[in-house]
Amino acid sequence: IPYKEYITDFAKDNAKLTGTEKDNLKYAHEEADKFLKESSGVVNYLVKEFEMKKNAQLHARTTISKTGIIDPLKLHSYKFAEDIFKKISSIPNQKNHGMIFLLDWSGSMQRHIMPTTEQLLNLVMFCRKINIPFSVYKFVNNSEFDTHGKNTNHPKAPFVLTDKTPQCDQSTRLVQLFTHKQSKSDFKRSAQNIYRSAMYFGGYYDWRNPDHIRVPSIHAKYYMSSTPLNESLIAMDTILAKFKSDYKTDKVALVTLTDGSANSVSTKKGSRMAIKLGNKYHLCEYRWRDEKKDLTYHLLEYLKKKYRLQTIGFFLVKKYQELRYSFHVPYKKEALARSMFNKNKFIPDYSTGYDVYFYV
């Protein structure tokens, strides 16, 4: 779904609001505008840091955690984004670099959706400032609709399925939120829409926060559902090819912001799933504590090899205990890992299909 359609759908719904609903919409937009204004100073600082790193004769720099400008202890704060900026700054020519973001829009993200949205908006503003090609999508699979927001009986489907292909979720949609080609006004509208959505859904888990009641509901086809990450990575094969062709990028960074593993993808007639990497076929099957066998891992490996892709993942949690089924460390290092996470509020993992996977 292109960003123009996303903006238009919200505008049509907004036109139907009456009375108090209009006041509540104004409140949501004002909150979004306030955040963008407050964040502009921090983004400008990060841009300055980026330019310093590009300049070979400037060796000294003040780390973000010591400036006082950015709070390194804030969940999903700029300290975590700095690792992304380091990836960008390692490229000699920024104009030949691009970024694609995938935002998890599943129901379980409600607890994290506001800080995640704020983090995403800061990254988008940063990319706009340094003028690199980028595109931002949220992946959803609202079962009421297909990719065009029609009834599920609508004949058009995103995947061509046969008995020999993975049985991907046909309700999967990639909603484009932002792109470097957006006008300033369209960027603002998209930012207001996603911020309002985060206010609305985030209120479900916070009884002290009246925003769920106060903020108007959003268009039905943009509601939260589950996590079609694998389907989204399959779609990236098409999106990345066009992105690299259109913008002549030498390097592309793919960043996912999620709170857990992908939905499973089944096969027909009990067949086993495999993906071809180079001259070899690799079986894709779920094994507990062995992510290197699953479909997500192999899809990332496929995309990295085909597109010279850098991959960065963010896994969002409230506390270290939530990592017990995802982040696996030797028993003797468990106490150290817990201590690092509690101190820094994040911990990196280099053993997944991503180049680096941050548990935040």
Per-region residue spans from a language model:
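Acidic, glycine-rich A-domain
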Residues: I1-V360
